[in-house]
UniProtKB/Swiss-Prot annotation:
Database matches in Pfam families: LplA-B_cat
Recorded GO CC terms: cytoplasm
GO terms, biological process: protein modification process
Site feature: Lowers pKa of active site Cys: 137
Keywords: Acyltransferase, Cytoplasm, Transferase
Record's function text: Catalyzes the transfer of endogenously produced octanoic acid from octanoyl-acyl-carrier-protein onto the lipoyl domains of lipoate-dependent enzymes. Lipoyl-ACP can also act as a substrate although octanoyl-ACP is likely to be the physiological substrate.
Organism annotation: Wolbachia pipientis wMel
Positions of the catalytic residues: 171
Matching SUPFAM superfamilies: Class II aaRS and biotin synthetases (SSF55681)
Protein known as: Octanoyltransferase
Alphabetized Gene3D superfamilies for the sequence: Bira Bifunctional Protein, Domain 2 (3.30.930.10)
Main location (coarse class): cytoplasm
Membrane-traversing stretches: none
Gene: lipB
Length: 205
């Protein structure tokens, strides 16, 4: 069984990581159900295990070092953070590449419900859209596994302040931009998006 939790207040990043680490231990011990946690953070940058100082352009917000994969990214209001704590071993899916592909299919299917064509790129993790002839990232992935239980997850840009990205080179990728559902002409309340996320989740997972 997969539990769903929606936090309406902004969640401190370190508190979120601590909560995830406690939860995945419980899942591994079979003392808790899997969890999909939907939330938002206050404005901040996170630095994954591949992050380098060269990707910091201007320190507009606090930077948190984190154990997830990837480089620097931004989190803030208007972005739907999706933290997934899933037991891949119990699901007989002990394959990180397959997990990333499943996450990608899920978010692509969600975007399709809003007439947004999201695409997966083998060499650039995340979900991409073509906006006025330019490839831009609309969803960033950063995952970690412990004993085949996943944590961290996805940041989907719904209506964030995109100017907040100017302090970093997102995911260390030069020459690519970021976009949001709002910039693509789709204005959707988070509550409506959450319903679609849940519905489409069970088609993949």
């Amino acid at each position: 069984m997969t539990e769903w939790l929606i936090s309406n207040q902004l969640i401190d990043y370190n508190c979120a990581v601590k909560s995830m680490e406690e939860k995945i231990q419980q899942i591994h011990n079979n003392s808790a159900d899997e969890l999909v946690w939907l939330l938002q953070h206050p404005p901040l940058y996170t630095a994954g295990i591949s992050a380098t100082a060269d990707d910091i352009v201007e320190k507009l917000f606090p930077i948190y070092k984190t154990g997830r994969g990837g480089k620097h990214t931004y989190h803030g209001p208007g972005q739907r953070i999706i933290y997934l704590m899933l037991n891949l071993k119990k699901r007989n899916k002990c394959d990180i590449k397959l997990y990333i592909r499943d996450l990608s299919k899920w978010i692509i299917n969600v975007l399709k419900q809003f007439n947004i064509l999201g695409e997966f790129r083998e060499d650039r993790i995340g979900i991409w859209v073509n906006h006025n002839g330019v490839e831009k990232k609309i969803a960033a992935f950063g995952i970690r596994l412990r004993k085949w239980v996943t944590y961290h997850g996805i940041a989907l840009n719904v209506f964030p302040d995109l100017s907040h990205y100017k302090g970093i080179i997102p995911c260390g990728l030069q020459g690519y931009g970021v976009t949001s559902m709002e910039e693509l002409g789709v204005k959707v309340p988070l509550s409506e998006l959450d319903d679609i996320l849940k519905k489409e989740f069970y088609k993949i997972f």
